[in-house]
Amino acid sequence: MGDILIAMFGPDCNDPLQVAALNTLLTYLAGSSVSVLENIMVEKEELASSIGYWWDSRPNTVIWFQPSGVATEKLAFVEQRLFDILKDVASKPLDMNYMLDCVRRERRQLKFNAESSGSFYANGVINDFLFGKRDGSTLKDFGTISEYEKLEKWTDAQWREFLKQWISDAPHISLLGTPSKELAEKTKASEEKRLAARREELGPAGLAKLAEKLKAAIAKNDIEIPDSILRKWPVPGVESIHFIESTSARSGLAKQLGTPSNGVQKVIDRSSADLPLFLQFEHVPTNFVHITVLLGTSEVKTEHRPLLPLFMDNFFNTPIMQNGQKIEFEEVVTRLEQDTISYCMTGGGRAMNDPEGIAIQFQVEPEKYAAVVEWIRAMMFDSIFDEARLNAGLAKILADIPEAKRNGNSMMYAVDAMIHLERDSSVKARCTLVKAIYMKRLKKLLAKEPETVLSWLETLRKSLFTFNNLRALVIANVEKLPDPVEAWKPLIAGMDTKSPHLPLVKMSQRLSPDGHNPGTYGAVIVPMPTIDSSFLLSSARGPTSPTDPIIPSLMVAISFLEAVEGPLWVAVRGKGLAYGSGFKRDPDGGFIQFSVYRSPDAYRAFAAAKAVVESYINGEAKFEQHALEGAI
């Protein structure tokens, strides 16, 4: 696989109407599986696994397109095909209904980001400082989103002219990156030759002189700041940190965890309607609703677990049956986008600290709350496993694998999963090394025996979507939420609600013998000629519960060691041994892990970090009070 990167200048970053139009147009072109470029190049022609896009703030913005997962021999063709499609789109009437959907969706997402993302305002202020007018008038545009009302009135001709001016007919630069074994070997040999020549040029005396110079620089850099100076700026108390406070309430099976006594719980009790579904509510001051449905994988057969990546990719990108009629996936995605701010199916680790689980997530406006529950049921039970859609999903997964295999950090964690987890682990089944083998076989089987693959997927569906395997979390302003419990009735209609609730499986229950005794396998070295840096991951046993009394002390210790200009920073990053290093606590798997990120010599970075930790253990290094206060 090769790389393509395309860049062109865009409109003035200080023009809110032009910037809003650019965001909307990029969404129209490549924002989802039904957008023009994604639908043609990814879903239908299978030329790429995705079409990435973004823009950088400059006086003239810079627009970027990046098709990923492109076969090396097709790089030039795909680059040309992208512009052929863009010119074709600009030459014909646009789908103005979908364009209007994109305008409204962009506005919803902007409102959502303004509420939920700290960087939204920070980036706006920074961009105003760098590029805005000196009188501060540019920043006032942040106080309104009226530009989207204007865009709703734009005509087809205006949109097409904008597309031609800034994208389809604009001057651009295309970079095509072709992998080359010869160049990799040549670069390595050239670097070795350069170092040897430099050593010879300096000689023993020159090297010794440079070593002394380096030693003097390190000594100067390591001069400690007097404690009396640091004490002039006391660390603020934790009470000065303003958290978003939430009030919990529960319904159905969630009450087995306890029933809170508060006003929000009374609201839920009034609308519970004897619904047995496990529902956890978190009441916060928000204008939106965050919905997560957590699914366990304990009932998924071992042989079906490697199907999970395909199942998850296909979940929202497949036809459904409604009232006896087949609704094609393009219409499904279009309707989903009309009703939501965002949606996805992802691993439970990222969403709910349940790595072995699967999570369905939605962010919506309160008035769409009930509609989303209907969507969840429709995608669970009314979706159709379509051969064409499955083939497209497999093509995307396979196209992404070479890029993942060129990523040192990604491969490090993939190898870690292969060593420390057993065959029944969903995390292991979804990792790159399993996908690389299984998906190729699955693609061949789908071509020869499609009914076999479809039957496997149906079995997987039935093992996931059962009443006793569902847990739902709703984060919203519950007091203003219409029918907070009643809205979930359609989801469990017709389900067997008598079966006992299935417990969630912790990753520590899916460990291999080597996972139970980390270190017994020994050191694993994975040569990767595609990268210049090295990466390292070291695992040891750790707490297996988030309520373990050692957790607070462990958190403070890690925070202390990892502080900017702290012990690890100075010993590893400060001396050029790695771009980054740090500890990770994983109570779900029962590990404490230390990682080194982008190092010229990962072992030296590990040894330096080890020496730092040991110096605090044996008392050679002292814990500075102000540093501990900052860590807390």
Predicted regions and their residues:
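Active-site-adjacent "gating/activation" loops or surface patches in catalytic cores
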Residues: M1-L5, C13-D15, S251-P306, P529-S534, ...
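A short beta-sheet element
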Residues: F9-G10, A21-L22, G542
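Bilobed periplasmic-binding protein/Venus flytrap-like ligand-binding cleft at the lobe interface
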Residues: A21-S32, L82-K87, V556-A563, A609-E614
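Non-catalytic regulatory/linker segments of enzymes
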Residues: V284-P306, Q325-Q361, S534, S538
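Low-complexity, glycine/alanine/valine/leucine- and proline-rich hydrophobic stretches
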Residues: V564-G580
